Every structure is written in C-alpha cells, then in structure tokens.
Amino acid sequence: MADSLSDRIQKFILENYLFTSDTRALGLDDSLLGRGIVDSTGMLEIIMFIEEQLGVTVKDEEMIPENLDSVSRIAAFVESKRKVA
C-alpha cells in the first residue's frame, strides 16, 4: 500500500532531523519548533521538501506555524493547496 501524505512527511522529518525510522519518535501533532526538532533553517528545508517532493508551492505569507509546525498541520496545508490547484 502507498504511504499516506502524513506518512511521507513524518518519514522525511524522522530521517532528516531525528535520524531514525521509529515513528514513535514523532507524533503527528508534535510541535516541530516547540520540541526543538527544527530551527528556521530546518523549516526552509521542509518547505523545499513540500515544494519539490509534494508539488505544492509555499508562498511567503503561508510560512507560518499554523501551516508548518507539525506533521498533521503540514499534511492539512498540502491537502488544502492541492484542492485549490
């Protein structure tokens, strides 16, 4: 079965920031900034992942924690952008 959008996002963050494949290390609603998983540079890398791997353009005004601070928020943001496109 194909990975869900949330699975793909979680896998990217686990492998690139927590250096593990253990999904227990990152809950879907865990704050990426609050837990210190990513900093501003890491957030830019996540935005590049969203644009390059998920095919969604992130505008400057959309680069806010409400859209990007957890796996579930990123997935919801990407889904909302895909519906508009």
Regions found by a protein language model. Give the residues of each.
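Phosphopantetheine-dependent thiolation modules in NRPS/PKS and related acyl-activating systems
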Residues: 2-39, 47, 52-53, 57-85
